[in-house]
């Protein structure tokens, strides 16, 4: 199976809004026994916001850190402005025809990506979630999962995912200014099946590659 990114996001991505300036609705066209996902997010958010030195990660948490040659305001915008998200969302070869973002704590998002024709005939896939905590230019915590175009959760098996693919993943994005560049740390908490964590890591990595290309074009 080829890679499909559950996030982000991201969380959506999440996964996975330009509420950099103002909030509002903006749309275009584990291992068990460890701390809770919320507790881990707050642990990450201390001090430098999720730098490797302050992180106590569970074995199957997914963590990717990238340094982008762009100011933190622009990298933040790349995740919070629907038009900007559409420029890079999805793994290599995928496009993002639409994006809906209500960037505020408790607000919802729906990220849309379309597979290339050679992969599942150009199938449309959606990731939706809710923003849990926002620290401007520093931290975004959110839930994310596969959904329909309206943001309603779907059974992952209906789009070809394994039966044990998680319905929802707690996630976070941390932003840190490093000189004139921005360090971004993307985290997806509590993956319980290793190969699916690896699959999401590959997809998220390709998304961030495309983000770097979009940022280079400003």
PLM ranges: what are they?
Residues 20-38:
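Signal peptide processing junction and immediate N-terminal pro/mature segment
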């Amino acid at each position: 199976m080829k890679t499909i990114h559950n996030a982000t996001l991201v969380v959506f991505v999440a996964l996975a809004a330009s509420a950099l300036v103002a909030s509002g609705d903006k749309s275009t066209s584990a291992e068990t026994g460890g701390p809770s996902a919320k507790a881990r997010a707050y642990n990450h958010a201390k001090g430098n916001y999720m730098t490797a030195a302050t992180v106590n990660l569970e074995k199957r948490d997914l963590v990717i850190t990238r340094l982008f040659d762009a100011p933190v305001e622009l990298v933040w915008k790349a995740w919070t402005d629907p038009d900007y998200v559409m420029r890079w969302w999805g793994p290599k070869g995928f496009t993002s025809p639409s994006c809906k973002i209500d960037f505020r704590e408790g607000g919802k998002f729906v990220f849309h990506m379309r597979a290339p024709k050679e992969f599942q005939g150009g199938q449309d896939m959606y990731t939706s979630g809710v923003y849990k905590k926002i620290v401007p230019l520093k931290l975004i915590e959110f839930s994310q999962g596969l959904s329909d175009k309206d943001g309603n959760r779907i059974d992952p098996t209906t789009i070809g995912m394994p039966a044990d693919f998680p319905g929802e993943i707690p996630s976070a994005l941390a932003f840190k200014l490093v000189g004139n560049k921005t360090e971004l740390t993307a985290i997806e908490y509590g993956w319980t099946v290793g190969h699916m964590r690896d699959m999401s890591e590959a997809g998220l990595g390709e998304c961030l590659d495309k983000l770097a290309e979009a940022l280079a074009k400003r």
